[in-house]
Amino acid sequence: DCSSRGLGDVYKRQLFTNGILNINTKELLPFDREMHFTQQLPYDYKPELECEPIIKWLKKTQDGNWDRVQVLRAWLRAVLLSHSDIQKFVEIVGPGKSGKSTYANLAHALVGDDNAMISSLEHLEKNRFETANLYKKKLLLFNDVERYGGSVSVLKAITGRDLIRNERKFQSGSQKPFKFNGLVMITANEPIQTTDPTSGLARRRLTIPFD
């Protein structure tokens, strides 16, 4: 996340532990003090590594459905590059031991602990301090969501890239609101149900079954 050059440049450069990767050219550049990053991926960039084992596993979880495999791969790329401009959240739905938690763990490992946040829908909607924890994160993860029938106003604001509160507990003075530049992932046994009467949530939801 290259804060000095605006959101568009986030998609072009990523900071690794061994240099700065130009996403378009795949060229690994040396560290540059003129580039100010707010996030770093916690591992080296190694172009010689292959992703075939992951692709093979994804094909297994999707019963060979290549289109869904490609969507899952594209989502991981979107998380890695902070493509919040798509204004979507992914909902991975399936029974236990179907691979949905493994996929969520893969996304978490891809960005690293410092760039991810784990929460619950109830906590996000009812705790006014929770949104502040999203600042400079790439991934907001809701694991194994049980039956939920409450408000999703904060979730809609986050995925719609609206300004959200930056209120921090035990800190006086107001902090500037910010836009969440990461993506949201939900894993559950069934699609979440909410009290939202509009189409705002439905058009942002991308449900992928893990059967």
Predicted ranges, named:
Residues 1-11:
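Single conserved hydrophobic/aromatic residue that forms the stacking wall/gate
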Residues 138-161, 194-201:
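Conserved AAA+/SF3 P-loop NTPase catalytic/coupling segment centered on the Walker-B
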Residues 197-211:
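A short helix-turn-beta junction within AAA+ P-loop NTPase domains corresponding to the substrate/partner-engaging
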Residues 112, 152-175:
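Conserved catalytic/switch belt of AAA+ P-loop NTPases
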Residues 19-21, 97, 146-147, 189-192:
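Short, glycine-/Ser/Thr-/acidic-enriched flexible segments
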Residues 16-18, 180-197:
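Catalytic nucleotidyl-transfer cores of nucleotide-processing enzymes
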Residues 8, 14, 20-136, 206-209:
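P-loop NTPase catalytic core of nucleic-acid-dependent motor ATPases
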Residues 129-135, 167-187:
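AAA+/SF3 P-loop NTPase mechanochemical coupling elements
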